[in-house]
């Protein structure tokens, strides 16, 4: 398929600047792939679509305040450092983006609040650097929780607010490492999760830390030529065991909460539709046509034009059916992107 197949006009007024309150009060568009039907619900109505024996898979990654501001040694020039991913915990090595990049060279030291100090050890791209934190035996995540800024998405045209630290985080976030929230998970509340569990649905978790490549533009017209950045994942043995059991017994369906869960599961799926457990890095890229091995239902948001997220959802829902419903969503005043409304596809 071509990049132009995923092009549509997204008005600024359709992009949610703030989340729904409460979380599960947002709209929910429900697509039945087999019947080609569309229903309009509220997210809390998601409960009605589960049956006893189904499995709900969450991504328990936690967004950390990845944007730091420091001063360069000697000149005291203000430098923005955006933490992308931890490369080596023992060595204190991180991939980062810096701004202004022209002022940051290999060998420079940057001083942050709370006596945090880093040295630039490599240039990776025009704005990319590898830095080493020089403070021995410190927990970087605990420090950035105090001094960092929450990295809300670039399409939200306002400054981060204190509320974002709580709302740009799922209620089940546990493992720090993401610079982008697993967006579909933002709509769940603890009471809704309990109600789903009480219905006989098993709720399990895996981890995938999404990075800024989520927002990276696809620059090739032939979408098969696009390359994804690698992201860390961990599929626990307990998670794989539950999924493999229901697949073998054909006793329920696998509901993936978001494209991150979908990618982690499909990256670890065998041709027989079983899941391998373990951790590693994945650059799994899903676009039409794609034969899903594990995921039976997908909960997701409304995504940006020409994005890899839209391509994945298009592969799951069937391209023409999905794009028709994106047009309908815009006409029906659905809100799009990170703080916007949701979609269930089964």
UniProtKB/Swiss-Prot annotation:
Intracellular or extracellular location(s): Cytoplasm
Domain of life: Bacteria
Record-level GO BP terms: queuosine biosynthetic process; tRNA wobble guanine modification
EC top class named in words: transferase
Main subcellular location of this protein, as a coarse class: cytoplasm
Chain segments annotated as transmembrane: none
Short name of any one Pfam family annotated for the protein: Queuosine_synth
Keyword S-adenosyl-L-methionine in record: yes
GO MF entries: S-adenosylmethionine:tRNA ribosyltransferase-isomerase activity
Pathway where it operates: tRNA modification; tRNA-queuosine biosynthesis
Keyword tags: Cytoplasm, Queuosine biosynthesis, S-adenosyl-L-methionine, Transferase
GO CC annotation terms, alphabetical: cytoplasm
Keyword presence, Cytoplasm: yes
EC number(s) per entry: 2.4.99.17
Reaction(s) the record says it catalyses: 7-aminomethyl-7-carbaguanosine(34) in tRNA + S-adenosyl-L-methionine = epoxyqueuosine(34) in tRNA + adenine + L-methionine + 2 H(+)
NCBIfam families: PRK00147.1 (NF001140), queA (TIGR00113)
Purpose: Transfers and isomerizes the ribose moiety from AdoMet to the 7-aminomethyl group of 7-deazaguanine (preQ1-tRNA) to give epoxyqueuosine (oQ-tRNA).
Annotated family: Belongs to the QueA family.
Quaternary context: Monomer.
Name of protein: S-adenosylmethionine:tRNA ribosyltransferase-isomerase
Gene that this polypeptide is encoded by: queA
